[in-house]
Each structure stands twice: as structure tokens, then as C-alpha cells.
């Protein structure tokens, strides 16, 4: 199956009134944009990660050619599998599982996806090098995934990848991405079976959000992290709990079912990558990370050129920022009977402490973004040392962690995060 099916589906979507172009994968939600679509002219990509293991952290790993910051499952002490990351050259990769690219008859289900991303971060500096890696390794790995990659040269592409083949979707190609944006959830356009896959509701929702933000010049890190990543709307049932009135009776609070929203009950982290402003400034490539469910945690910046990750984002076992977010999430999902864990208490999200959990989280995150923006302007004029970058990102992460602990002292003091 080639791009033929892609263009057929694209025509169907356009006829249905979709002015955006999207592709897909497994419960994660992803978006990618070329520099012509973003507010600052830098390529950008983002992933809400969904998985059954709530414990995520960052690690700084060394590769044969590049060192890199990586999102891993906390129990993976050696960092053998990576679920998103960026290296010191400014190359970043993310993915989402695409079961419809697997092969059940040959028992191929994408078990090599995470290890392959680790390989790519250690070896590749550009999108071109990643494509060459896919060619070199074809047939050697169990892959069933949608890889998203950007680089310091402005490249921004998705690769629908299976064991024996891949198809490239370039955000710079007007046939593929007429507005420079591509999004994905749980299915692949090059799948041989159009009825397999999932995440179609999130696919449509994130497409609408991106399509609305782009022409207004709002497609930036703040919009993606604070609006898209934390979105709780379900367009199919016309539900938007952040916009509707709260319950009048405190004994009957408003809840939202979060299995089909972008911010899901299974969302365990969010990562956003901003490419370099120019080819010679790869050191300014930035990785933002929210450890924990996006509505329960705040994003902090990481620069792989710093040569390390901030202490609150990592640890010998779990990461402090992730532990704190788990406690907040437990407060937002108070009913754990049966499948009731899928329901988020909107009243708590919007009213805790007089202003709500989300408002408190965003205030902490705004401070981190303001500090990062000022420092990047300074660094663009004069390249900093790795030590200076490391010290700064450490101070931002520590400030955010301490602020969150203060804001949610009551919650953290009484809640034990589920393991």
C-alpha cells in the first residue's frame, strides 16, 4: 500500500469539511508542524503519551554519535526503550503504536518501536539520516508505528513504518500537508485494512484544534501544551466540560468521561519539541515535558545540549514531578470502583483552592515559559556553555516543582499515588 490510499482518504476528509490533514496511531495523540505553520517559524511536534504504566521519567543517555534526553518508563533502569526524545544535534523523535501496521499472522506487533527510537537518537542528526536508517534496518525490527521526527535543519516528517516497509509524509510537501501540519492518533493511512486502528474521535478533535490555531498565528508551544494536550472535549457528544456551567449541588459534581478525550485517564506524560531557529543554532532545540497526566502536571524545558536532565524530571526510581502529578491525578479521579476510574471530577479541576487544579498548574507553567523565552533570546545572541544551560533548566524545574508542592500541599499530604 502506498500514498494512493492516503490521497483517497485525504479527498474524503476534505469533502467532509476538514481543512487539515491527519494520520494516526495507538492511544497516544500526536501533532507535527513545519516552520511555515508555527508562530515562531520553527518546526514543532508533540505527543500525549498513553500507556498502562503511570511512572515516567527522563534519562540522559549516550549514543555512538549523539547524546540525548529521553522519556522512559521509570522501571526501565537502563533506558532500553525510549518513548520520545531529542539529541544534542537537535534531532527529535516520537511515535505512536499503529496496530494496523502489524502482522498478527507473523506475530509482529511493534515490540521493537521503543528500542528503535533509542537507536535513532544515538545515530541520527537529521531527518535524512533517519530515513537512511529506516532503509538500512528494513526487515530487521518488529515495527508497527508512526514515527514523527524533526531536526535542526527545519525538517518535519512522519514515517508510517512496519517491519518491511515505510512511507514518508513530509510536512513541507503541499500534497501531503497543504497547511504544513499533520496529526495522528491510532491508525495509519497506509494500513491494508481501513477498518482497523482507533482514536478516530481524537484524530478529528486534534485536527480541528490545530486547524483553528494555525491561521490565527497561535500554533506554538503554549497553545499545544495548554490547550491541545489538556483538552477534555468530546465533539461526538458535544461535550466540553471546561466551558459548561459547574454543578449547583456540591454533592453532585460535574464529571467527564476521559477515555475518548485528548487528555485521557491513561495519559501519563506529554512531550513537545521545538526545532532550532536556524541550522547553526541546534543547541537552542528545546524539549518540553509534562510528567504525569497533562491536567495534573506542569511542563518544564529541557535542552539536550546541556548534557543532562533536571533532577525533578528523573531519579533512581521515579521522578519527583511525576510522583506529584500522580497524587494530583488521584485527587481528580476519586472513584476507583470498576470503570469509574475513567471519570474526572471537573469541579475539582476548576474550583480546588478557589481557582481550580488546572489554573494552578497553568500559573506554574506560565512562569517556566516566561523564564525560558527570556533565556533563549539571550542564548540566541551568545551561545551558552553546557553547564550554563544545565544550571538554568535545573533552576526552572526546581522552581516549578516547589511551586506545585506548595499549591497542592493538601493533596500531596493525604494522597498516595497509585503504582
Segment roles from a protein language model:
Residues 2-13:
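Bacterial N-terminal signal peptides that target proteins for export
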Residues 21-27:
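Sec/Tat signal peptide C-region and signal peptidase I cleavage site
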Residues 89, 121-127:
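A short, structured loop/turn motif at beta-sheet edges
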Residues 35, 124-125, 137-138:
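Sec/Tat-exported extracytoplasmic proteins
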Residues 129-149, 155-157:
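Secretory/export targeting leaders with adjacent low-complexity proregions
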Residues 29-79, 84-85, 95-122, 145, ...:
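C-terminal, well-structured catalytic/ligand-binding subdomain of enzymes
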Amino acid at each position: 500500500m502506498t500514498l494512493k490510499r492516503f490521497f483517497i482518504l485525504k479527498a474524503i476528509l476534505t469533502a467532509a469539511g476538514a481543512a487539515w490533514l491527519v494520520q494516526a496511531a495507538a492511544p497516544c495523540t500526536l501533532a507535527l508542524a513545519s516552520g511555515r505553520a508555527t508562530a515562531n517559524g520553527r518546526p514543532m511536534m508533540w505527543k500525549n503519551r498513553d500507556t498502562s504504566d503511570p511512572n515516567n521519567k527522563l534519562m540522559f543517555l549516550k549514543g555512538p554519535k549523539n547524546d540525548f534526553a529521553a522519556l522512559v518508563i521509570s522501571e526501565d533502569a537502563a533506558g532500553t526503550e525510549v518513548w520520545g526524545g531529542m539529541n544534542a544535534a537537535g534531532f527529535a523523535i516520537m511515535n505512536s503504536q499503529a496496530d494496523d501496521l502489524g502482522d498478527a499472522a507473523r506475530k509482529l506487533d511493534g515490540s521493537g518501536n521503543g528500542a528503535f527510537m533509542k537507536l535513532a537518537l544515538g545515530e541520527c542528526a537529521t531527518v535524512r539520516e533517519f530515513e537512511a536508517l529506516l532503509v538500512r534496518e528494513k526487515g530487521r525490527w518488529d515495527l508497527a508505528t508512526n514515527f514523527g521526527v524533526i531536526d535542526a535543519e527545519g525538517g518535519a516528517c512522519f514515517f508510517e513504518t512496519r517491519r518491511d516497509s515505510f512511507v514518508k509524509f513530509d510536512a513541507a510537501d503541499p500534497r501531503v500537508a497543504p497547511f504544513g501540519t499533520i496529526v495522528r492518533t491510532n491508525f495509519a493511512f497506509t494500513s491494508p485494512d481501513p477498518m482497523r486502528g482507533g482514536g478516530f474521535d481524537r484524530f478529528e478533535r486534534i485536527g480541528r484544534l490545530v486547524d483553528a490555531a494555525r491561521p490565527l498565528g497561535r500554533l506554538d508551544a503554549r497553545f499545544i501544551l495548554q490547550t491541545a494536550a489538556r483538552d477534555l472535549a468530546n465533539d461526538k457528544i458535544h461535550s466540553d466540560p471546561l466551558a459548561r456551567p459547574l454543578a449547583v449541588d456540591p454533592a453532585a459534581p460535574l464529571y467527564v468521561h476521559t477515555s475518548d478525550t485528548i487528555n485521557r485517564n491513561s495519559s501519563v506524560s506529554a512531550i513537545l519539541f521545538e526545532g532550532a531557529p536556524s541550522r547553526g543554532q541546534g543547541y537552542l532545540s528545546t524539549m518540553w515535558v509534562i510528567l504525569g497526566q497533562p491536567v495534573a502536571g506542569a511542563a518544564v524545558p529541557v535542552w539536550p545540549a546541556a548534557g543532562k536532565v533536571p533532577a525533578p524530571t528523573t531519579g533512581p526510581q521515579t521522578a519527583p514531578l511525576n510522583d506529584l502529578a500522580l497524587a494530583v491525578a488521584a485527587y481528580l479521579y476519586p472513584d476507583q470502583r470498576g470503570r469509574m476510574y475513567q471519570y474526572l471530577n471537573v469541579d475539582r479541576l476548576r474550583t480546588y483552592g478557589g481557582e481550580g487544579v488546572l489554573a494552578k498548574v497553568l500559573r506554574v507553567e506560565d512562569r517556566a515559559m516566561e523564564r525560558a523565552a527570556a533565556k533563549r533570546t539571550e542564548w540566541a545572541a551568545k551561545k551558552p556553555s553546557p553547564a550554563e544551560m544545565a544550571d538554568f533548566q535545573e533552576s526552572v524545574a526546581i522552581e516549578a516543582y516547589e511551586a506545585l508542592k506548595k499549591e497542592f500541599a493538601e493533596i500531596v499530604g493525604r494522597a498516595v499515588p497509585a503504582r
